[in-house]
Amino acid sequence: MLPIDQIVTQAMAAEPERLRRHVAQLSIVRNQLLNPRAIDRVVRYIADEFDHAGLPVQAEPFHWWPSGWRRHKNLIATIPVPSAGDGGDERIIIGAHYDSVPFSPGADDNASGVAVLLEAARVCAGFGRAPRRRIDFIAFGMEEEGYVGSDHHASSLARRGVPVAAMVSLECVGYTDRRPHSQQIIPGLPIRVPDRGTFLAVIGNRPASPLADALERLVQLVAPKFESVTLVVDDNGRALPATRLSDHAPFWDRGYPALLLTDTAFLRNPHYHQPHDLPETLDVEFMTHVARCVVALTLTLAFGDLPREPAA
């Protein structure tokens, strides 16, 4: 197990200017059905950034019949385990979707998530040690059409019996609003939520409860002034459908422990799915805190013992 001070030091290597640059490059209307050339440009950018981080990149193709069986793809960059790794086939998955809805440049949704994904991959790769558990950084395609890419990947893992120690979905992680009452709240939430939109929401299924607890502890070490709010849902969030609206849901439905990290999207951001979802609306300091927390969690899970539910 790594000393926590080494994890914190490495997490602090996430740089705001890199996040800003990624968002600027990714914030173009990029929808597979309307402008596949823009999708190709974004895919090349993501692949190049993974390559610059020194990570092997694999394209995972899939088809979707409403698009005329056109081929789409996920991009997977991997930090492998050595052949004698004691984590076996277990893997850690950090994911974010790279597509946008038609007519929106999607800075928050979801250039912000991909930016954090790329920066987390760079910082984790720069740690320079082989982990106990394989780490996959995945840029998912076709999320806006119903989590098609992530569903394909989760289905493939489940079919092959591949164990997933943790999945983290990065969905809209760049928008804040410090005004009172700027945060909308889902009816029926079993927790209290601040009325200012300045926190990161961490939402997990029941198997991910220990992961959420571990992340809460790491937030206090990596970003003590950063506010996060955690919600663990039963029955994979079916009683609260808004908690299922991203690429973590296919993993929940196959029994894998998964967390959603989000600024809560339309519950806070008036630019959501609009032509004015632009880079200048984002809070890069907030994104930097998210990236550092993701790095800390990833390294903790990849190099240490997995957190468990306390014994009853």
Where do the language-model regions lie?
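N-terminal capping segment at the start of a domain
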Residues: 1-38, 99, 268-277
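Extracytoplasmic/secreted proteins, especially bacterial periplasmic and envelope-associated proteins
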Residues: 18-21, 25, 37, 41, ...
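Sec/Tat-exported extracytoplasmic proteins
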Residues: 23, 27-34, 50-54, 79, ...
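Active-site-adjacent substrate-binding region
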Residues: 180-312
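Acidic/histidine-rich catalytic neighborhood of metal-dependent amide-processing enzymes
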Residues: 70-71, 100-213, 240-243
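Structural recognition of the beta-strand scaffold that forms the well-ordered cores
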Residues: 22-25, 76-78, 92-95, 136-139, ...
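Proline/glycine-enriched tight loop/beta-turn segments at coil->beta junctions
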Residues: 82-91
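A non-catalytic alpha/beta surface segment that caps or lines the substrate-entry region
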Residues: 21-82, 228-232
